[in-house]
Amino acid sequence: MEASTGKILSQQNSDTALPPASVTKVMTLLLIYDAVHNGKIKWTDNVTISEHAASMGGSQIFLEPNEVQTVEVLTKSIAIASANDAAVAMAEFIGGSEDAFVELMNQKAKSLGMKTAHFENACGLDTDNHLLSAKDIAIMSRELITKYPEVTKYTTTWQDTITHTTEFGLTNTNKLLKWYNNATGLKTGSTGKALYCLSATAKKDGMELIAVIMAAPDPKLRFREAIQLLDFGFANYKLIHGKKVGEEITDVPIYKGEKDTVKAVVQREFTTLANKGSKAELTTKTEIIPSVQAPVAKGTKLGELVYYIGNKEMGRVNLISKDAVNKANLGTMFQRLTYLWFR
């Protein structure tokens, strides 16, 4: 999957629901970053470790009951070392309990269109119905890396340390960081049921790709297959960029405004995929809302910029007002009428 567009470049059995193991933690990380972004928690907040969180088996940082760590330390431990105890501690901190956090995970999955996803815990340990498809994993991975690209601060870190009872070393579980020059993350997973899983991300020439491997029979195979998928994407596709955010497109007439017109600017950048070697070029058409009347707030939608390749519409972005335009007062309106009358 290409991250900026969400377009799937290659897939096989992508809708089959399977145990995801610790790749589950992509959703856990996404909800942590959401909570920080929304102001619910801060990176410096202290988290008291519960007995339940400390009891997690599998990959862990050996947290003790009643130990206190910051949100930042626990998040780093999840992203780098795939720590189950840290994941459950953060789930309890955000949700109040792991079960309540799992409800948030499933709600988020539904809102993202993850059609087969069913979470039963925050860390990915095997249960009967904890299942995701490769497409589900690609969708949540895309949301994490495009909405919070700063996560790569941790997902690209090979080794780090934290301090609790003693200094504890963190080593990244993602060997792709050593094997693939353009790797940016993201998350490994392995259990008896899930076998070996991977959500791999890599960025080259401004294009970021996501490769998902599930149920590989050995740990090295998941990395080799992910590299093959990433190489395929980078070798065969390129991104075409539209106009830049804030670029001025046209002057829009404003009825009864202090100013006669306002600049319509691009609200967001548009990108689309094309085959490498193709001569595909983007063309545009402007569609403006008729009869825009003052007052107009800065950022008001004034129309749309429509992108085409040939005769095929590829997408649309909003055109918004660059500045605010207040309603004209009676004196201004009188001056305009006088000008029109005597010109």
Predicted regions and their residues:
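Active-site-adjacent loops and short helices of periplasmic peptidoglycan-processing enzymes
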Residues: 1-149
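Domain-terminus/edge residues, biased toward the C-terminal soluble/receptor-binding domains
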Residues: 114-115, 126-131, 135-343
